Structure formats: C-alpha cells, structure tokens
Amino acid sequence: MATSQKKNLLKKGFMFETNTSQSIEIGRVFYSHLKNKKKSLNIFTANVFDAISLKEELIWFYPELRINHLPDWETLPYDQISPHPELTSERLLALYQMTQNEFDINLLPITTALHFLPPKSYIEKFSFDFKVKQEVDIEAFKTRLIENGYFNVDKVLSPGEFAIRGSIIDIYPMGSIVPYRIDFFGNEIDTIRTFDVDTQRGLYPTNKIKLLPAREFPIDSDGVSQFRENYREKFNGDLSKSKPYKNISKGTPFAGI
C-alpha cells in the first residue's frame, strides 16, 4: 500500500469495501498507528455485511485490537415498529463505549452513520452506577428509571424493563447480557444478583451495575418539552388527535421510534 493511501486511511473516518487482503493490510496500518497515537479510529463500511465481515477478519488477524461495531436499527424510516430491545441494548452499549474510548476501531455501516446519533453529553447524563451498600431512595430511583426510558412491568423479560416488588427491584439494564435483582434493606442496597429471565431465580452476586439510558432520545421533562415545542412548529391541525404528540407528551414512547 502506497504511503499516500496509508495517510488517507488514518484520517478520522473513511469508506471501506471489504476483502480479506485489504483487511490484513488495513489492520497492520491501524495497529501501527494506534500503538503510537492511542486514538480510536472510525471506519465507515458500505453496508452491515461489510462491517461484520471486516470485524471478524480483523479479530482473526489482529486479536489484540479492540474493535467496536455499532449495529444498524434494521428498520425502515417509516416502519410502524421499533428496533428490537436487544438490538437497542447493543447500540447503546456501543455508543457508551465510544464515549469512553474503550476501543481502537469503531465500525459503522454508512446506513447507520447517516441516522442522527445521541450526543456524548446525553449518554453521560443518563448513565449511572449502583453498588452494594449504596443508599438509594426507591421512589426517586423509580422516577429516574422512567425518565431514562425504562418500562415498569410486572415481570422483567427484556432489556429496558424493571419491576418493583416491595424491597426488591428487578431490572434489565441496556447494554447488559443479563438482568439483575437488587435487594434493599431500608434504603440501602443489601445485595445485587443476576437472575434467569425464564425461571426468575437468582443466580450470581455482584457488587456493582451500570445503567445506561433505555433509548437513544430523552423522554424526561426537558426532552418532552422540547419535543412538544418542535412538533407544534412543524405540524398544523388538532394536536389532540395526534397519537405521537399525545403519547410523547405523557412520556410514553410508541411503536416506530
């Protein structure tokens, strides 16, 4: 690969069409660059398939590289369905890790990159930790979860859900592959354990969990106010008949967003 081509690759981001020989050379160039600069790089691929293929090839040839892939929503712009909760969970984890510079290379299909992404400030504002022995007001905790986009349900089964039963809170954090059961003693977190969604039985103890926002947009009071203002500017007519306007005004997301 010519020197001029290598310099072009080391710009902040570039388009890439995958094949194995290119993957080997590009990985070598990136590895050398990252060792010296210690700054993550963005690669934009033509489609999701190229992103997945490139990730697999780079991991095979350069296992020491930390590679992040931001998944696509896998929905069309005007679909009346929302992305699958597990997919949203993967995206939010990837976005959070990008804000923390946890990876050497970020892979983004161009279809994914063309969508609006939440700013770093949003991810940081709505992410928080909980740990054993921490004092927490349960009602305030419930309010915060709802403002973060989590659904209050009877039984936790999917990412983005939580349930409260007396002094026990079950929650499936976005970005986590397992749900957690938080047991309180008064206002103090006594224990935190993972649990099985099928049997609902507790499994393994842990000392700390990370909670990411449940959505890529805010539905707290400030977010709802901004939505209402912008909606009134863009659309005319009787807003009382607008389902999106009414639902978001109540802080309730609807299918398709």
Each predicted region: which residue ranges?
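ASCE RecA-like P-loop NTPase motor cores
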Residues: 1-257
